[in-house]
Amino acid sequence: MREQGFIPKDCHFKVSAHTGHGNPCSAKLMESLGANSFNPVRDIQLQMLAAIRAAIDIPIDLHTENPKSSGGFIRHYEVPEFIRICAPVYLKTGGSVAATHSWDTTEADARKRAKQVALVKRVIDEYYPEAIVSPKY
């Protein structure tokens, strides 16, 4: 549909972790259907992330943490490996502050989310300082 002009070329489609995809085959299928980035299920192991990266060329979106309602886990110390294995990768940070998904964020919550971002950046700076930030689009 992009090639035919029905969808603008600069319209990006991001496959959400809520769709439940978590293997190389489904990642490749989503890419072939026009996905611009792929967000696998949140608790996926590093080995599976490496297999997904080998299967697709589009960026991978990864949650560094989650709200309590969807596991409540924090993976900050895995972030350097996320980058090494999955680049290009977009990190989704700050979710552990929320009680649930689609939760209204207060000013205090925004400050807590910013703190989570700073913590992830500190882990990257400490354990993978040679990581390169992607250009902004």
Question: Residues of each region from the PLM?
Answer:
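Short beta->alpha connector loops at strand-helix junctions that form conserved
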Residues: 40-42
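Active-site pocket-lining/capping segments in soluble small-molecule metabolic enzymes
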Residues: 1-18, 46-137
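Conserved, mostly hydrophobic/aromatic
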Residues: 30
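Generic hydrophobic/aromatic pocket-lining and core-packing "Φ" positions
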Residues: 24-27, 49
